């Protein structure tokens, strides 16, 4: 199967999305989605999944550096369940330092990070998905 994966950098009002190539080797930036409520976000993700032959999502999991959960982790836990309930395969990927890595990449390319939050989310989602793919993925 050549089903693709979508990586998600989850936020309260927007998410950064990346997509795998059909062979699940490389993560490619896709888009940032702004949303007003979870129902709207889930609908948009379903549409994108259908358009791109996606059956699986990889969601960044925001643990603290000491491996403890925080408020955002609890929101991602709920989001994980909602995506699963839509009959997608959903995986969690440690996202610690993904935003910092995204900022570093942007600075190395002389891209300003200050007012470029969407670009940071997009690169962070790409880092999250690439980290997952690098671990080796079983064809679902």
Language model regions located:
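Phosphate- and other anionic-substrate recognition elements at nucleic-acid/protein interfaces
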Residues: 2-5, 13-140
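Conserved catalytic-loop position in the HRD/HxD motif
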Residues: 9
């Amino acid at each position: 199967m050549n089903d693709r994966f979508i990586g998600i950098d989850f936020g309260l009002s927007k998410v950064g999305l990346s997509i795998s190539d059909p062979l699940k080797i490389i993560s490619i930036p896709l888009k940032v989605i702004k949303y007003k409520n979870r129902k709207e976000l889930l609908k948009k993700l379903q549409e994108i999944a259908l358009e791109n032959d996606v059956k699986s999502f990889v969601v960044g999991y925001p643990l603290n550096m000491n491996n403890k959960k925080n408020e955002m982790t609890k929101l991602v836990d709920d989001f994980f369940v909602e995506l699963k309930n839509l009959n997608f395969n959903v995986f969690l990927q440690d996202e610690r330092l993904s935003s910092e890595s995204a900022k570093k990449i942007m600075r190395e390319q002389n891209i300003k990070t200050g007012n470029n939050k969407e670009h940071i989310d997009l690169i962070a989602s790409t880092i999250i998905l690439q980290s997952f793919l690098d671990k080796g993925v079983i064809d679902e």
